[in-house]
Amino acid sequence: MAEQGSPRRFARIDRLPPYVFNITAELKMAARRRGEDIIDLSMGNPDGATPPHIVEKLVQVAQREDTHGYSTSKGIPRLRRAISNWYKERYAVDIDPESEAIVTIGSKEGLAHLMLATLDQGDTVLVPNPSYPIHIYGAVIAGAQVRSVPLVPGVDFFAELERAIRGSIPKPKMMILGFPSNPTAQCVELDFFERVIALAKQYDVLVVHDLAYADIVYDGWKAPSIMQVPGAKDIAVEFFTLSKSYNMAGWRIGFMVGNPELVNALARIKSYHDYGTFTPLQVAAIAALEGDQQCVRDIAEQYRQRRNVLVKGLHELGWMVENPKASMYVWAKIPEAYAHLGSLEFAKKLLAEAKVCVSPGVGFGEYGDDHVRFALIENQDRIRQAVRGIRGMFRADGLAPKTAG
């Protein structure tokens, strides 16, 4: 019990570090209150409208009197069948809608609840570093220990993964993967997943794959699903969210497919935690998955054009960032002249002097501290304005373009 006058302590909350992104978010809001025009390329929050046919379906179903009660925590059967059909048509994978699919309130909720359902004190989870924060802290909240696996340039990630499994005592219970990666935009081919599944089966390690950016792909490249690997469902599950593909981030709807035991575990804990997503949202999700997918291609094309503008602009400044072939992010190594600052201080500098808000790489793990992440969430004119702001900062610091990177 806390002493009188002292703050109460909550052990689970104490395990969570300060949220780095809140620091830059608060500085951004303070700057805007002062009237400064800040180009916000920080949070991966789509700025486009949800396709009209999806919105129309939501409105239509929401006007029915019989759709406003509690839904089911596993998702309505019709949506689970649509998920099954989506996998069949897209990846030639059979998913049983009754035992191998579950609807989630966005993938973030599903990931967190899956880890809460399956992990406990003493369990070890392998997570790429850097990685999307819920991949790390979902395990921490569940009480498990996280072992970071470096996902950095010049390092063979699979070899590091294999080394981590063999070197962990006790043996890891689960690995969390996400490709195309947030924040690094790193991609893998199907043969990578084949090796992962073989390794996981050899050591009996559960595999959770986050396929959030399946559709945000460029230049003819296609993102594979781990479910395409024969036997993957024996040991793996995969999450997908409608947030990015259909500009439905605020709708909070996604799904998980794969191993029936893990699907059942998630369904069981969700039956205690929630009543599922609002039924009209689920029916609208059916319209998204089963409707014309040109809208998805159009959204990806918009991101591709923004990527081109940002990468070209930074290259012209001498900041030679990688050109991603997927995701809605540019993962940029901090220019050598600023490397000593680390990602948080460099992000603060960009905000104060270039009027550009980015995500500091350290927020995704310590191995990300030499990078910042640009999210492609402003239009092309605003991205060009961001490049001009960065150019001004470089010039003020005496950096010619050729020495900026």
Language model region names:
Residues 31-34, 142, 202-203, 317, ...:
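Helix C-cap/helix->beta junction micro-motif
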Residues 286, 301-311, 321-334, 368:
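Conserved glycine-rich beta-strand-loop-beta hairpin in the small C-terminal domain of fold type I
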Residues 2-106, 113, 288-291, 397-399, ...:
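N-terminal small-domain helix-loop-helix segment of the aminotransferase-like
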Residues 228-229, 233-304, 308-317, 393-394:
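Conserved core segment of the aminotransferase class I/II
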Residues 147, 151-220:
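Active-site phosphate-binding strand-loop segment of PLP-dependent enzymes
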Residues 93, 339-342, 349-359, 363-405:
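PLP-dependent enzyme catalytic core of the Aspartate aminotransferase-like
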